[in-house]
Amino acid sequence: MKYNKEKLKNKVYLAIIGMPHGIRGDVFVKILSADPQRFKSYGTLYDDMGRSYEIVTLRTQKNNAIVRFKGVENRNAAESLKGIHLYVMRDQLIDDLREDEFYQVDLIGLRVQEYGGKILGEVCGFCNFGAGDLLEIRLNTGKRMLIPFSKVAVPEICMDSGFLIVDPMAAGLRDGEENDQ
């Protein structure tokens, strides 16, 4: 595993390393990509510190995989990798997204606004606790909120203009009573 801090500037979060599997250095990896089969084709992966990871073997299971990385030869070495986030460089991505697909990293920083143009805040992150993706919004008040990342709550994304439209009712930002303060 080489160390290269410069490589972190243009990264896309792709996976997280889980528990060891067996005694030969294999680990479970949760892949965040829509197509786990492509995981190995991305080539070299990087962690938060810029260390590189090269996949030697990979077996997929739904959105997870059992992976052996170069230089990880036993269970002890595999255990030391648990919890590491893996990134791929942007130029390594296969750019065949459909019109309604986005990389999460591209949405961070977009303005969040209502249909009428009122700016509510900006996208500052994503979460997924098992029931679907949630957008983390930093409201103009400084407060952070999680809203469902669905067509109902987020009916429109305008990447070129730098904003997305949110339906405040569907997103849970307002209750049933209109409150225009």
UniProtKB/Swiss-Prot annotation:
SUPFAM superfamilies named in the record: PRC-barrel domain, Translation proteins
Predominant location category: cytoplasm
UniProt cross-references to InterPro entries, sorted A to Z: PRC_barrel-like_sf (IPR011033), PRC_RimM (IPR056792), RimM (IPR011961), RimM_N (IPR002676), RimM_N_sf (IPR036976), Transl_B-barrel_sf (IPR009000)
Location of the protein in the cell: Cytoplasm
GO BP annotations, alphabetical order: ribosomal small subunit biogenesis; rRNA processing
Keywords: Chaperone, Cytoplasm, Ribosome biogenesis, rRNA processing
GO molecular function list: ribosome binding
Gene3D superfamilies on file: PRC-barrel domain, RimM
Top-rank lineage group of the source organism: Bacteria
Ranges for domain PRC barrel: 99-172
Cellular component GO terms held in the UniProt record: cytoplasm; ribosome
NCBIfam families found in the cross-reference section: 16S_RimM
Domain notes: The PRC barrel domain binds ribosomal protein uS19.
Family, as annotated: Belongs to the RimM family.
Subunit structure as annotated in this protein's UniProt entry: Binds ribosomal protein uS19.
Role, per record: An accessory protein needed during the final step in the assembly of 30S ribosomal subunit, possibly for assembly of the head region. Essential for efficient processing of 16S rRNA. May be needed both before and after RbfA during the maturation of 16S rRNA. It has affinity for free ribosomal 30S subunits but not for 70S ribosomes.
Protein name: Ribosome maturation factor RimM
